[in-house]
Structure formats: structure tokens, C-alpha cells
Amino acid sequence: MSSPTEVVSPAWQWLGIELVETGEGSAVVEMTPTADMANHAGFVHGGMISALADSAMGRSLRTIKPAVVRAMSFDLKLSFISAAKVGETLRATGGVVHAGRRTAVTECRVEAAGRLVATASGTFAITREKE
């Protein structure tokens, strides 16, 4: 896997998501949730974890050939395994399961300090670079 440097989306900047590494068909992203991302119980809100997983899966699609120039999720399923604490770094590892001409299926694991927080799967509409 490589350690890329590139411009990220405004949503990634707002959430504090950072691209850690990519490989063919995979991407790792991280974020460290802040207190304003907590739910009423004081744990990280599930929507923040969902956004992180969606970001990892979408970014993994940008690593395949022919190149994907746009990926938009139209189905996202999450299973929450354990609570995430504010201030602990969450690492999401996304991977491409299958990519056709117009749609792709992906999967993701979200972990905190080696502990599984959530698993996810997603289906994306993709636009590929013309060959």
C-alpha cells in the first residue's frame, strides 16, 4: 500500500477524515471524533461512523482500473459491534468486492485500537474513465 497525499473533500475536512494509505482495490482512512460528534450517551454518533465507512469504501473505488472518476453510494449497510469513544482514533479499511461498468460492491471494517467497532457494505454507482 502507498501513503498518498491529495486534496480531500470539504466533508472530509469538516469530519477530520484523513487518507492513510491506498492499494489496488483498498483504502484506509482515519478520524479522531471530537465531543461535538457524540450521541446523547457520550459515545461517537453512528452517523459519524457511517460517514467514515462510506468514505473508505468510496475511496477504495478510486484505486481500481479502469479508473473510477466518480463514485456515489446508493446503498449502505452498517452493523455496529461496539461503541466508539470520543477522542479515540477510528480506522476504516475499505475494499472493493466487485466492480462492473456502472456499479460496484464494497466492504469495510471500522476499528479503534484493534477493537472492531463496525462492519459495513455498500453499493455504489460509478463512472469510469474512458479508455
Can you name each region flagged by the protein language model?
Residues 1-131:
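Terminal targeting signals and extreme-terminal segments of soluble enzymes
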